[in-house]
Amino acid sequence: RTQLSPEVRPAFFFADDVPTSVRDSLEFAFYAAITEWGNFGPIEYWVVGADTQAAERLADRFCEHRVQRGDLSQEECEEIGPRRAEFVEYASRAEAMLISGHPFIDAGWNGGLEWGLHLFSSSYPPGWAGLEDARPEDDQTVLFHEYFHAIQNAHLDTLDWSERQELMGPVWWVEGGAEFMAQVATSRLRAS
């Protein structure tokens, strides 16, 4: 799959409790990854905050967006309970993180190839949220790591999931490659 023009911008979707400063930091880092490695979109990036009701609303927006694009019917989207459950779980864990002060982040490349895009989701990024003992640099590296999975997947010419898994190779290779590339790129960019 070829790279897209830089004018084809990622679509970011944030829960309504995610502050503007966090949104701006995430978008800036994502554009840095695109500048570093090229634009392998179209891309959707869904970010949950720390409020479960806001996460529910984001899940509603996810379904509305899928229906509007013609990817799924409303009924099909509502049957995909794991996405809603994932958003609510992310918010619950982020709320606990803010109370405890123990940072964590869940993020992932979630496929989307059947809809002609790369789909990502993320919990509340603790470094960009300003949580003590959390470094924004770690959030940047996580984002670069996940974007590298889109690059890995963009170079496979089949939509058959089993065949894709076989072509990607062992999990340690896929994850190790993404982590290596993310660490090297973010370290170099921060040093420049």
What are these regions (language model features)?
Residues T2-L4, T35-G38, G111:
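Short, conserved catalytic or adaptor-binding loops enriched in Gly and charged residues
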Residues L4-P6, A29, E137, R164-Q165:
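Alpha-helical protein-protein interaction elements
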Residues G108-A191:
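Zinc-dependent metallopeptidase catalytic helix centered on the HExxH motif
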Residues S5, S21, S25, S73, ...:
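Generic serine detector
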Residues T2-T20, S121-A129:
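Acidic/histidine-rich, surface-exposed loop or edge segments in extracytoplasmic proteins
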Residues V8-F12, G41-Y45, L117:
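Hydrophobic beta-strand segments of well-ordered beta-sheets in folded domains
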Residues A15-I105, Q140, F144-Y147, A154:
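Zn2+-dependent metallopeptidase catalytic core
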